[in-house]
A protein has these predicted regions:
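Membrane-embedded alpha-helical bundles of multi-pass enzymes
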Residues: 14, 18, 34-37, 191-198
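Membrane-embedded architecture of ER/inner-membrane glycosylation machinery
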Residues: 142, 146-430
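Specific aromatic-rich, kink-prone transmembrane helix
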Residues: 1-6, 41, 199-202
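Transmembrane-lumen/periplasm boundary regions of multi-pass, lipid-linked membrane glycan transferases
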Residues: 4, 19-20, 27, 32-185, ...
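Juxtamembrane helix-boundary/capping and inter-helix hinge elements in multi-pass membrane proteins
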Residues: 8, 82, 212-213
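Membrane-interface transmembrane helices that cradle and orient dolichyl/undecaprenyl
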Residues: 1-14, 207
Length: 430
């Protein structure tokens, strides 16, 4: 859309725009078209190049042309799902945004956070560069604005309007996306992903400036980063060779079951494998380059070395540490265990489906092939029942006079998606 305005001055309508927006609506719902048009509309207004009527017609034609394929899908889905489907669509897409009642759906929308959540999420998402920019603020020479506050605001506004198109569009996109997702009650870190590339443009320019004009700060940052990465590399190496047992070491300082399970999972992830060795070799290479550049005086190369090191650290965290944690705490292993031990099929597995009162076992449902049935509504004669360890006693108490439950298996670990152990039982109507 930016190229459409820059190259064609809004003449015609490139086929790629409605096709991409069609795909956005099908994957993310109405926000897939509302948010891009909101950003583009504000950008066109700030260009002060087109009339309000021209901007309105541009957004209208773009929006209408992007609804044909999604409307066909929504109509067919509504024919199959009826009002239940419509209620979920309205709740998920408009109930979240407008803080509407959730009475027409059987679960809480959740993810309710304060307005500050988005800013904390962005700061965490850009780590460790956020730390570099934060500490750079202490060396800034703050000057009192000249003239009245109104004059200062006008000068700031004129400065923004005088930005080149790429920077102006990036600024508009960053502010509009963050502002847009401050409005709904539901807030999640993934909602802000569209803003990251645009914010990164300004962050990269700030980091380049610091590298050229405040090289000491950049080198201190690189040194601290290299030291922390070195500790992580040595820890992984000691665990891999069996020199250090991370779980045994941690047990001397904490007795928390979930903490010890997590540390044990990380230790298991450090066991030798092709992917683990490749990541550690890359991390070692990045460390050697960083140590070498720390003793050189070419600042830009030091920055490049830091970028490569941060990339390898992310590989280390996501490719080894988090992979181990997710594999150990995933519902997949327990699903495989109970499916192999008991004759579970698409007709005999039941759960409590009132998600306002009971935990959603969505992970197990996925790994068992989406075979769950609603125990409350179907009231079956016999079958298998799944619930987490917090809900299971409530179910036993509620149906004590109607069903008998025989506990068969409990997950050995706390499953990440439900934050509790899950119990499998066999039931029969009395």
């Amino acid at each position: 859309m930016y190229r459409w305005e820059e190259k064609l001055s809004l003449k015609g309508l490139p086929l790629g725009i409605p096709l991409l927006l069609n795909g956005a609506v099908l994957t993310k719902g109405p926000v897939g078209i509302i948010l891009p048009l909101f950003v583009f509309g504000v950008y066109l207004l700030m260009l002060r190049k087109y009339s309000l009527l021209r901007i309105f017609k541009t957004l209208l034609y773009t929006g209408v042309s992007s609804l044909f394929i999604p409307m066909l899908w929504y109509i067919e889905a509504w024919k199959q799902g009826g009002n239940d489907f419509l209620n979920v669509v309205l709740a998920e897409n408009f109930g979240r945004f407008f803080h509407l009642s959730e009475a027409n759906i059987s679960y809480d929308l959740g993810h309710k956070e304060g307005f500050w959540y988005n800013f904390v999420t962005l700061a965490a998402g850009f780590m460790p560069w956020t730390l570099l920019l934060f500490f750079s603020l202490f060396g800034v020479s703050w000057r009192k604005p000249q003239g009245s506050f109104g004059r200062w605001v006008r000068n700031a506004w004129n400065t923004i309007l005088s930005l080149d198109k790429i920077r102006l569009f990036s600024l508009v996109a960053s502010v509009c996306i963050v502002f847009f997702y401050m409005l709904p009650s539901s807030k999640r870190s993934v909602y802000l992903m569209p803003a990251y590339p645009f914010i990164a443009l300004f962050m990269s320019q700030a980091i380049l400036y610091l590298t050229e004009h405040r090289s000491k700060l950049t080198r201190v940052f690189a040194g601290v980063l290299t030291a922390v990465a070195s500790v992580a590399f040595v820890t992984a190496l000691l665990s891999m060779t069996g020199t250090v047992d991370l779980a045994a070491l941690a047990s001397q300082y904490t007795s928390g079951v979930s903490v010890l399970q997590t540390i044990e999972a990380v230790g298991q992830a450090f066991h030798p494998s092709v992917s683990t060795i490749i990541v550690l070799v890359l991390l070692l290479t990045a460390l050697l380059i960083s140590y070498y550049q720390l003793f050189k005086k070419i600042n830009i190369k030091m920055l490049y070395a830091s970028i490569f090191l941060i990339f390898c650290v992310h590989l280390f965290i996501d490719g080894i540490v988090m992979r181990g944690i997710r594999n150990e705490n995933s519902s997949r292993a327990f699903a495989r265990e109970i499916r192999g031990a008991y004759p579970l099929n698409k007709d005999n597995v039941f759960v409590m489906n009132n998600l306002r009162q009971y935990t959603n076992l969505y992970g197990l449902n996925f790994y068992l092939g989406n075979c769950f049935h609603n125990f409350e509504t179907e009231q079956p004669q016999t079958g298998y029942f799944l619930a987490d360890e917090r809900d299971y006693p409530k179910v036993l108490e509620r149906y004590a006079g109607v069903y008998t439950f025989e506990e068969l298996r409990t997950s050995g670990r706390i499953l990440a998606d439900v934050k509790a152990r899950v119990v499998l039982s066999r039931f029969a109507r009395k």
